[in-house]
């Protein structure tokens, strides 16, 4: 589960790509979508087929007709991943952590990307309020990983980790392959380092293959449409 304010989608994408580079079948759930809701649910980088969407949607609606939009999509994604028999599910949280739909599922690791001011009307007016809510995504005995945080936010994470008996691992100084990244911007190294930290732990726990050169290829292959994406000029239109 990927929780935070900035870089959740990028970190989720990096983790998915690194796992796929090592031969795993990966389900990736992100939000919001850019063009179509189908983008939110991907299996090995491919959107859920259009003909499967209504079939699975009907099953979710029949089982739980009163879900919110995000809860519905979360349930649909989990159902799609279960049917596909994926090896790893990467779930990006939608809003906060305490009551987010992705927190309802059991997880093997929780990642915290940089936490900042967002959704103040729902999560609270201060960074402490926001970080406290997001920190509640931690589960007892489940390791948590965090990117560098503002002091206020880190204090909240450390306090919740102690209360829940969770080991919180700070990733700023952990080993990281020196490779090109598929996502643009110097800030992406923070997200990639977090993804590598949780991948190293998961690979060790499951005895998955884990080679630095393969991880580097995975990081370089990352692509997230609409996020600092460069589109070349075509049909008389300028590049974007």
Which residue stretches match the model-derived regions?
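ATP-dependent carboxylate-amine ligase catalytic core
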Residues: 21-105, 123, 129, 151
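Aromatic/hydrophobic pocket-lining residues that form π-stacking "cages" and hydrophobic walls in ligand
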Residues: 15, 77, 157
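Walker A (P-loop) phosphate-binding motif
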Residues: 1-34, 39, 109-111
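Internal gly/pro-rich beta-alpha loop/helix module
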Residues: 108-109, 121-200
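Active-site catalytic microenvironments for nucleophilic, acid-base chemistry
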Residues: 18-22, 80, 198-205
């Amino acid at each position: 589960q990927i929780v935070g304010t900035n870089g959740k989608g990028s970190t989720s994408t990096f983790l998915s790509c690194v796992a796929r580079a090592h031969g795993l079948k990966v389900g990736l759930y992100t939000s919001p979508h850019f063009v179509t809701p189908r983008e939110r649910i991907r299996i090995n980088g491919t959107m859920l087929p259009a003909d499967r969407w209504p079939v699975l949607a009907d099953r979710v609606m029949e089982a739980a007709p009163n879900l919110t939009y995000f809860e519905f999509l979360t349930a649909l994604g989990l159902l799609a991943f279960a049917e596909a028999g994926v090896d790893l599910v990467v779930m990006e949280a939608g809003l906060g952590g305490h009551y987010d739909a992705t927190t309802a599922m059991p997880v093997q690791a929780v990642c915290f990307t940089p936490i900042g001011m967002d959704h103040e009307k729902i999560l609270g007016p201060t960074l402490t309020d926001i970080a406290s809510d997001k920190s509640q995504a931690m589960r007892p005995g489940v390791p948590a990983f965090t990117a560098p945080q503002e002091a206020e936010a880190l204090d909240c994470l450390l306090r919740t980790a102690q209360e829940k008996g969770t080991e919180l691992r700070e990733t700023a100084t952990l080993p990281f392959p020196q490779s090109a990244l598929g996502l643009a911007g110097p800030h992406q190294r923070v997200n990639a380092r977090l993804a590598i930290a949780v991948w190293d732990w998961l690979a060790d726990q499951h005895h998955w293959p884990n080679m630095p050169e393969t991880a580097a290829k995975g990081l370089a292959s990352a692509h997230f449409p609409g996020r600092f994406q460069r589109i070349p000029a075509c049909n008389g239109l300028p590049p974007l």
